[in-house]
From Swiss-Prot:
Gene3D superfamilies: Galactose-binding domain-like (2.60.120.260), Glycosidases (3.20.20.80), Immunoglobulins (2.60.40.10). Glycoside hydrolase that may be involved in ulvan degradation. Ulvan is the main polysaccharide component of the Ulvales (green seaweed) cell wall. It is composed of disaccharide building blocks comprising 3-sulfated rhamnose (Rha3S) linked to D-glucuronic acid (GlcA), L-iduronic acid (IduA), or D-xylose (Xyl). Its EC number is 3.2.1.31. It catalyses: a beta-D-glucuronoside + H2O = D-glucuronate + an alcohol. This is Putative beta-glucuronidase.
Amino acid sequence: MHQKIVECIPLWSRNLNSNVKGMRGEGIACLLIVLCSIIYRTEAQRIETNFNNNWHFILKDSPDFSKENLDDSSWELLNVPHDWSFEKGVRKGGDQGQGGGYHDGGIGWYRKTFSFSKASLSKTTYINFDGVYMNSEVWINGNRLGKRPYGYISFRYDISKYLKVGKNTIAVRVDNGLEPSARWYHSCGIYAPVKLVEVNPTHFKPNTIFIKTPSIEKQQGVVSIDAEIKGAFKGLKYNVELLTANGKVIATHSEKLASAQPSVQLEVKPPKLWSPESPNLYKAKTQILDGKKVIDEKTTTFGFRTVAWKTETGFWLNGENVKLKGVCEHWEGGPVGGAWTKPMLRWKLQSLKDMGINAIRPSHNSTPPMFYDICDEIGLLVMDEIFDGWHKKAPEDYGKQAFDEWWQADVKEWITRDRNHPSIFVWSLGNETHSDVAPEMVAFGKNLDPTRLFTSGAGNPEDMDIQGVNGGSETKSFIENNKLTKPFISTEAPHTWQTRGYYRTQTWWRDNELSGTYELPNLTEKEVFFYEGINPKNWKNRKQRFNSSYDNATVRVSARKYWEVMRDTPWHSGHFRWTGFDYYGEAGLVHGGLPFNLFMGGALDVAGFKKDLYYFYQSQWTEKPMIHMLPHWTHPRMKKGTVIPVWVYANADEVELFLNGISLGKDKPGTVWNEMQCEWLVPYEEGTLEAVGYINGKVVNRTSFSTAQQPSKLKTSILKLDAEGSFTDSFIVTSESLDTAGHLYPYGENKVYYHIQGDVKKISMENGNPIDPTSRTKSDFRALFFGKTRTFLRALPEPKEAAVVTAAILGDKALYTSNLITIDAQHIQLLGKSKTSDLEIRYTTNGENPETHGKLYKDAFMVEDDTTVKAIVKQNGKTVLSMEETFGKNEGLFWGDEHSADMWIGRGVDISAEEGVLTGAAKPSREAHRFKGSGFVDFKGGEGSITWYQENDGEPGDYSIRFRYMHNNHGKLHPMKLYVNDEYVRTIEFEPTGGWEKEWKFVPTIIVLQSGANNIKLETTGESGPFIDELFID
């Protein structure tokens, strides 16, 4: 292999011909020149190697695990991305608590052995990690490289001096021993790609290429490219080429390198602008050359677009006033925890884009680089966010552990890594946090990128360029009385909840109806739907219910109303709804804790199934004709004639509704919030309900529901996500329950079993059910949830063949509609040639083993109450699945009636404030109305505290509590510190309730109670307190 040795004399040497004899003689001088030599291979100036495969992992801790020579053959062999917490699953008492969906933390180690050639030793070699959560430490051949506390940042180490010819070993320790370290579910481990980068000693320093577009006109765009070169020496050339996305060269520049920090400008005529509608991209190829030989080459994607913010009119993109139609999205939102591959991540983001969004806020942390690459490509504007808090928010989070020491290093990595992405339109420094460090952070960030403005989600708005407001932006008072002094964006709104397939006609407010909310009336005088996931008699608190899909379950405002407000308010730049996908964690705040383990605020559930809300946004934000109807038309326990609100979301001119072929009239979608859906009140009768959309009088689309009978067969569909970059194909296997006529049975809850074969690995099984305790990774089944479930698979490296056998014992779990049971099994080829597959089913209904006593299944059969059906599936004579399903009147969903509409009334524990221990200015009072007990506590403008005593006869764990309060001090929140058993928990804020006489409201939160005695204290913080009436423990 050809090699070249070049004398290393820095460009900044004052005398390039100076004699070095005076140092220690000519021999030493020659030695110095040799040591400073640059050796490079012209055939491969930059080599990036996929380092994702063949890691050994163990969930234990020992200092010996860092050693170079260690027998790790018994450890688990896996590929990254990897999330051990997700793989372990939900556990009562899980380390991450309710905020983390009861998942665990722990300490884990990864080790990887690789070979290195003699020729590569002359290179500079980096190991790049795109994301490790958290407190990672890295060793190479037993040599410690360093520690990176933050779990949501990329980093790298130069490992050159520790490498050797032959075997080398990387060891990574990941420490999540202190939990909870986030307020939502977080991954644990190496959850993002890893790569090895070999470059010549003279190379572009990481993250130093900075592409700006200082001038963009219709016919000409100027591109400015800055770079920083490590190991520059005399005689080098610097080349820049600009290329279109398909590789056509459109501009070039070449110069002798006169500085280690070259800066050049080129022109593009005319530039194609980047936007969500037309995400036009360009590439800049930068090269360092010695003569004609390329020493280093880097290709960077960029785009042309202009961004402007105006206080009166909001956000402007490419000279057009644009509303930001966005979602907040946790990295972990969706079905795989934090271990996303690029094909799966593209599916996730494209699903959101297809809903009609044009913007996304990764909440509340930066994400791996592939996220921004995809947003560039598909056209999603990104509010790029770095931190949740600038101090402690979760008990053991980054704000507590490392922020003060590490924020500058993390902000530098974040901005210099991401600043070339055209999708990123604003930087966000934090979320619902406050600190004197904010001005310093803004100044530090602007030094790294002067081309973008800074905001935060309700953090130090006075120090930000753009005022970001979270939930407070949903209130009438904010919208109607706001006097802005700077541009505004709603960084987190609206907050609505919805469970796919579940409906209620009565409005649900998370914290009871707050003052200053927009109207959201009930859809019917009385409730007409009475099913639940849990029998209310078994609820642990009043929150353990599902939420309606009618867009009538919220904190302050419906999705429809907030879109109207945003659309029609000129200064309102747009919103980022909470959230796009459902996510694991924060299960206590809204739903009272276990068995709930996830948050249902998304427009898609964690399995990626689209909720009705998804189609509302699609009807408002997309132009391709669409139509969607709700609810379904299968209501087996409903009285005939019960009036059901039927809604249709459509972007048609008008919609006509038919029931059993008879027209029920036409309706036109309106622009006012409660007219955005077409609506009919339809007396229920079995049959077919059909909606037909018209544009200019012509039918453009139609949708229908037919009343389904008991589930009798499976519908299985496969979505293949093509391999991309270093990642293999992924597959989404969707199973649905159908009746014999092929209609979806919308209450399907039977278990679907999966036998995975060949060169694929099961990543997750998910159905969107917030109370399903089944392991998502270790079980071989997942129950249907309202008729649907999914399995997510990833192909192994170099796959050849793969298949899946799916099977289910199908029927009405409660045997209400029918006692007829069907068993269905299917073989589906994923990769390779389809093979003959003979499937045989044997079953029993008397508890006996179907392997030895099973009857050959030929046709559907009847069962009695409280029967367990056991079955096996044999493939070509070999048993591949063992199944069982229990049927009976006490199985499955809870079905109630008008008497069970709210069975929680009268339950729980309420403790009057005046009966607690009062200190300071806190005094009992009766000078108001509608208080509970003998009075309430009035702080009379002073400082003090209330302490309640509670004997917990139940198990220790998370409990939902509410404080009943009242005040009318507009603009004040009267923050009070909450302590439980003398441990600070959080600060509670009390919004004005609208009066001082009888306008009592509740503010909820979650606390941990121990068994036995507990003390709960509220203490003022210098701003006095509201009237406090009682503490209610749900």
